[in-house]
């Protein structure tokens, strides 16, 4: 069973760390190759993984507007194929591609359509795909990226974060996001757990609560020192909590129809709005 999932949420809730830990979890299980996609315009997944990148899909899109019109036929597609392949950061067990900033002014129809074809072919070479997405779902909603099996919306343990998660879910509905199932992860939960106020906010999202990830001092120390997720101990509470969720998703112990509402019924039956 392959996983194609995206972590989405407002900046600062820890979705990039969770994305990096997910990639590491898959590689550690021998589930390579994995494609890591940084779809946040403020790219920092590479830092969490401890790698560097030189080119972005956004840069390729800009180059396509200026350079491709002078090419003919297959040369256009070959140009984009070569550029995307060159943009891949190849690591042990996974490759990383950085989407970069959204398009600027002007017509990008050809570039987007051609890139979509290139990325679709590229994605078929991988067993699993993990997308680190910003709350605006820019690259996913524009169909620059493929259909998702899971949209995992990440919040921190704050009312503002959970309300943003709800808006992300609303946006996913508005743009008919190509995601099979979705759910909520509340990150950085204190030892006392979720307050009653926060529980009510979670219920109001209409999203199933898939997991709570504990506030982990080891992650705070890791971030403070600029270290990568490899520095997080195997028994770190946050790592163990996320691993438990990934096990359930990967092994199919929760069927998508029972664990998370499908796109046809994204809010489930309890949403009365």
PLM feature segments, named:
Residues 2, 61-71, 232-233, 252-255, ...:
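N-terminal regions of ATP-driven nucleic-acid and macromolecular assemblies
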Residues 3-41:
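Walker A/P-loop phosphate-binding motif and the immediately C-terminal alpha-helix
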